[in-house]
Amino acid sequence: MTLRKLGWLLLGALLVAGAGEAQERKVPYWASINTGDALMRTGPERTYPATWRYRRRDLPIQVLQVYGNWRRIREQDGTEGWMLATLLSAQRTAVVTGNGPAPMYADPSSSASLNWRAEPGVVGRISNCESGWCLFDVGGKRGFVEVNRIWGVDAGEVVE
């Protein structure tokens, strides 16, 4: 077998393994929209009408159901519908909620120095979530935000 054929076989095996892993995730789970143009539909096929067009990359969503290559999702305001799995990413993101800016601290403590403030509606990537805090990154501006000020992570959830 040539090296080229072996490479194609390995690539195919990785793609199949990755697809199976995505199917096995336990719902509900968090994900994000990975494109600046995504349609939410009323059902799990392209023949169903689109109800919403999303033009905001990294918007957090919650996956409620898996049906083939389709995911039934819920967004922050409670709207539910179907979206192609290829439009979604495992990248964890969150959106600031509540009244007024959310403080972003240097450490996961309200007594730590204040790095930034993020207005409600600001979307950022999250990591290092534990004990009620998440590291929130908005275009390189980072700080720890209390979990109760963001939508995109469950209370008590640990995110690496």
Q: Where are the predicted features?
A:
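Classic N-terminal secretory signal peptides
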Residues: 9-14
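Bacterial N-terminal signal peptides that target proteins for export
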Residues: 1-8
